[in-house]
Amino acid sequence: MLPTVFIVSDGTGITAETFAHSILSQFDQKFRLVRVPFVDSLEKAYSTVEKINEAAVHDGRRAIVFTTLVDSVSNDIVKRSNALVLDMFQRFVEPLEQELELKSSHAMGRGHQNADTEEYKTRIEAINFSLAHDDGQSNRNLSEADVILVGVSRSGKTPTSLYLAMQYGVKAANYPLIPEDFERGKLPSALTQHREKLFGLSIDPQRLSEIRNERRPGSKYAAPENCRYEINESEAMMRREGIKWLSSTHKSIEEIATTILQEIRLERQSY
């Protein structure tokens, strides 16, 4: 029976879930994850406790709860459940209040109340830009890009571009390197005037073949020898052109994005 882990929040729960994943990944154990977002009333807090207690009875062991509930009354209700409750706000906010000699607002969802802020507008603009400039769809306004990701097809360019846009408000375009580019031995002409904005992604050829086979099984596009050729050529081109690059093979999207921000020295515009 897998231990049950609850992610309880008065908002989306993204913060609590990210923290929970970081902690749980330290253990060689699988977990059953239950997300309980928008617990913004006492009624919902009591309902959450019922779910937690039912899981404890079913599993024959206490549940594990990661919580970011700001309301102290709701928090106290959840803490009475049959669970190990890991309260992120109590753990971090109270020591900060003491250190800063300043009371926190204890306002629910304050971290996400940004719909009218410049950060939110910047993020939406970045998302629209990244979608419009995905996979070399458009060369218009490439000069507005903060970064242009290059690499062979299925090397992780699209998810990384969108993550940079959604998480940090970075205008990230991405452009594929294709066999015709390797035959010419040159970057696509649309990219040459934006060389300082280029960042490359590569990937292990075997892993690339596996990913491409899911999309087009048995094709030349997915063949191991073709994948090796494309990766070798793309890495040679990036070295020749002086383009910074990394392998996405064993890295999460978060790690890739953070590395890119560090390498091109972009400020994180949103959080």
UniProtKB/Swiss-Prot annotation:
Extract the Pfam families matched here.
Kinase-PPPase
Q: Where are the transmembrane segments?
A: none
Q: Which residues bind ADP?
A: G151, V152, S153, R154, S155, G156, K157, T158
Q: What UniProt keywords apply to this chain's record, in alphabetical order?
A: Kinase, Nucleotide-binding, Serine/threonine-protein kinase, Transferase
Reaction(s) catalysed by this chain, per the record, are:
[pyruvate, water dikinase] + ADP = [pyruvate, water dikinase]-phosphate + AMP + H(+); [pyruvate, water dikinase]-phosphate + phosphate + H(+) = [pyruvate, water dikinase] + diphosphate
**GO molecular function annotation:** ADP binding; ATP binding; phosphotransferase activity, phosphate group as acceptor; protein serine/threonine kinase activity
Q: Which InterPro entries match?
A: Kinase-pyrophosphorylase (IPR005177), PSRP (IPR026530)
Look up the EC number in the record and give it: 2.7.11.33, 2.7.4.28
In the record, the note on similarity to other proteins reads: Belongs to the pyruvate, phosphate/water dikinase regulatory protein family. PSRP subfamily.
Function comment: Bifunctional serine/threonine kinase and phosphorylase involved in the regulation of the phosphoenolpyruvate synthase (PEPS) by catalyzing its phosphorylation/dephosphorylation.
Protein name (Swiss-Prot/TrEMBL): Putative phosphoenolpyruvate synthase regulatory protein
